[in-house]
């Protein structure tokens, strides 16, 4: 924990928006994006560090805060507070999470089972949001964080859409091009299958094995009707791959089946081969 004098000095050196009248003391910038800035701040009442988000479009700030408040899930950062700055902009405070963005975490030499395990946890969180009528619309590795305690968090719900939003808001083109479903890029109304597309794009960056790429390609089909129809179906195919079973999206060749069989039953096969080699050696020694 940083000492009180050090916090005061750090705050004095940092020039941020005026937060007079709030319970927060700004310390530094945690991140910037097209929607606004996230600051590291100190909650002077509870004496703890928080992430304080301030965006330029108040309606979207309120939208994200409301969505986060209603989605109580281990994979979604909880909202602590919501309010208005002296200049009229809205802010909200959330738990300050320490960890790595998913793209940086994957670059640190994680094995395939670890990476796919994290991907499945992202799917679980997104499926939970879909069950509550929320479509994220900007899923990408940069918006997923792996925390220092192993938690996997889906961030940045500022452009998420809900059934209660206006048709114009739901059709607004938002997101990141390489993860954006075609219907989203065309400015059409989207449903949860736009997030399935984005998850498929994320999956492509995780592994280059044929079954995994087949899953990703199915999730990224141009037509929503050709994709997995929900996140649970996508996750189920990934789980089948991890369990050594055939995946629905991939038509296996004989060599693929043999390789999968070998991965699934590696230890028994090694034991049988060891036994056979030992028997052959024994027979050879007896007849020498």
Task: Annotate each predicted stretch with a short phrase.
Residues 56-70:
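AlphaC helix of the eukaryotic protein kinase fold
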Residues 82:
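Activation-segment/catalytic-loop signature of the eukaryotic protein kinase fold
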Residues 42, 98, 117-120, 126-127, ...:
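C-terminal lobe helix-coil module of Hanks-type protein kinase domains
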Residues 87-101:
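Conserved short submotifs of the Hanks-type protein kinase catalytic core
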Residues 149-183:
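Activation segment of protein kinases
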Residues 42-49:
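Conserved N-lobe loop of protein kinases adjacent to the ATP-binding glycine-rich P-loop
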Residues 27-33, 38:
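Protein kinase glycine-rich loop
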Residues 101-111:
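AlphaC helix of the protein kinase catalytic domain
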């Amino acid at each position: 924990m940083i000492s009180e004098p050090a916090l005061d000095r750090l705050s004095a050196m940092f020039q941020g928006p005026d937060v007079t009248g709030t319970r927060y003391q700004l310390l530094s910038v945690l991140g910037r994006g097209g929607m606004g800035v996230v600051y590291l701040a100190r909650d002077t009442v509870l004496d703890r560090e928080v992430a304080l988000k301030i965006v330029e479009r108040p309606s979207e700030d309120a939208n994200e805060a409301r969505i986060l408040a209603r989605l109580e899930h281990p994979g979604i950062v909880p909202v602590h507070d919501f309010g208005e700055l002296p200049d009229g902009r809205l802010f909200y405070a959330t738990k300050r999470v320490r960890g790595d963005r998913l793209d940086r975490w994957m670059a640190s030499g994680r094995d395939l089972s670890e990476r796919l395990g994290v991907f499945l946890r992202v799917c679980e969180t997104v499926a939970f949001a879909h069950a509550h009528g929320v479509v994220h619309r900007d899923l990408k590795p940069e918006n997923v964080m792996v925390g220092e305690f192993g938690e996997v968090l889906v961030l940045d719900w500022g452009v998420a859409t809900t059934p209660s939003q206006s048709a114009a808001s739901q059709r607004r083109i938002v997101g990141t091009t390489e993860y954006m479903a075609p219907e989203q890029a065309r400015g059409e109304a989207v449903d949860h299958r736009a997030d399935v597309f984005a998850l498929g794009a994320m999956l492509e960056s995780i592994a280059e094995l044929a079954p995994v790429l087949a899953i990703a390609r199915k999730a990224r089909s141009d037509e929503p009707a050709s994709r997995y129809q929900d996140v649970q179906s996508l996750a189920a195919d990934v789980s089948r791959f991890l369990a050594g079973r055939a995946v629905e999206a991939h038509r296996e060749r004989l060599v693929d089946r043999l390789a999968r069989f070998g991965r699934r039953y590696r230890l028994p096969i090694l034991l049988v081969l060891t036994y056979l080699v030992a028997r052959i050696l024994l027979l050879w020694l007896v007849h020498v």
